[in-house]
């Protein structure tokens, strides 16, 4: 204030004194300061011209387009092919009798999503990070080339700025916070009309899912209450259940994955594909909806892919409906009830009987 006062020869009432003890006095003091500043503007046309010209110049200096910005008016999130279940290519799936974990099915579809987006729109659709589990949870698939061997590796702000895979550590809360923030950044010309930006995907052990809950719940509230359009989050609860394997003594959480259900109705979809071939159809169907959060529960070990046709089971693509028949009623027996099964080891055990 002193520099301003000396330069424009104006006094600030009670300048240098302690602030008033009551709110009314503080408001009065603030008003007097503003009056002093405005008095200079009223009596100094040169200052007004300078401020106006400077503001106009700054506004006109903002480019209408930034050449090196990867996000353009072409919007991959509106590309129905990426999430179209009937058109999913055969090489996303493995043949009956082969052994594969469902997390590998996730990796394949992740690479399919971003490869299609990069090839058609010049940028990935999904930015991913993991709690030091990028490869074991297979979220690293978002940085791999679909149908090829190219691996973009981990993002580096100097050496590798094009990779969609962030090098995060065991910082679950921070990871979900960063991606919740990222998925609210809308580059669309009218952010109230549609979302054009990046989706986020993050992973950790299912037993540590609760560490991600807070920021994701806040993201859910924005999606629910704000008129601004937001993106989507893929919340991977990896290595879930008794299949946690060698880490089971410290990393096996029975109840923790239940935190993925603590959202308002219609604001999260929980996916539990029990085998490799169900992942892509289930995730594609979920991403085709307007639901902003998808929790994908995956397991660690490989299991044998069933021969669905021989067993009379529905196609793996029926996983896109959320539930399907493994075995229908025996028409020669009375109807004795329904068995509902979910999860890798439980469903695998039932199918093998």
PLM features per residue range, with description:
Residues 63, 76, 86-89, 101, ...:
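Proline-rich intrinsically disordered, low-complexity coils
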Residues 128-130, 202, 235-237, 270-274, ...:
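General beta-strand structural signal in soluble alpha/beta enzymes
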Residues 134-262, 277-281, 318-327, 336-353:
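Thiamine diphosphate
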């Amino acid at each position: 204030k002193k520099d301003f006062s000396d330069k424009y020869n104006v006094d600030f009432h009670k300048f240098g004194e302690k602030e008033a003890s009551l709110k009314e006095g503080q408001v009065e003091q603030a008003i007097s300061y503003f009056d002093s500043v405005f008095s200079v503007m009223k009596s100094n046309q040169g200052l007004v011209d300078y401020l106006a010209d400077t503001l106009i110049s700054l506004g006109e200096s903002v480019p209408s387009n930034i050449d090196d910005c990867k996000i353009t008016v072409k919007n991959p999130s509106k590309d129905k092919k990426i999430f179209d279940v009937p058109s999913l290519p055969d090489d996303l799936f493995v043949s009956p009798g082969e052994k594969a974990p469902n997390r590998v099915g996730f990796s394949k579809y992740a690479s399919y999503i971003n490869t299609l987006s990069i090839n058609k729109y010049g940028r990935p659709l999904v930015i991913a990070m993991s709690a030091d589990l990028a490869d074991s949870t297979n979220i690293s698939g978002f940085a791999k080339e679909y149908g090829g061997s190219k691996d973009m590796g981990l993002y580096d702000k100097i050496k590798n700025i094009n990779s969609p895979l962030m090098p995060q550590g065991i910082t679950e809360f921070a990871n979900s916070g960063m991606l919740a923030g990222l998925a609210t950044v809308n580059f669309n010309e009218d952010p109230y009309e549609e979302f054009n930006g990046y989706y986020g995907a993050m992973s950790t052990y299912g037993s540590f899912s609760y560490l991600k809950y807070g920021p994701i719940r806040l993201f859910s509230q924005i999606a629910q209450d704000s008129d601004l359009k937001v993106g989507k989050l893929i919340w991977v609860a990896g290595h879930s259940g008794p299949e946690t394997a060698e880490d089971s003594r410290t990393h096996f959480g029975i109840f923790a994955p239940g935190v993925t259900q603590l959202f308002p109705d219609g604001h999260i979809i929980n996916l539990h594909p029990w085998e490799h071939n169900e992942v892509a159809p289930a995730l594609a169907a979920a991403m085709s909806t307007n639901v902003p959060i998808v929790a994908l529960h995956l397991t660690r070990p490989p299991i044998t892919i069933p021969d669905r046709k021989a067993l009379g089971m529905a196609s793996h693509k029926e996983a896109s409906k959320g539930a399907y028949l493994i075995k229908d009623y025996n028409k020669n027996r009375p109807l004795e009830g329904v068995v509902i099964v979910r999860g890798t080891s439980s469903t695998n055990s039932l199918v093998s009987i």
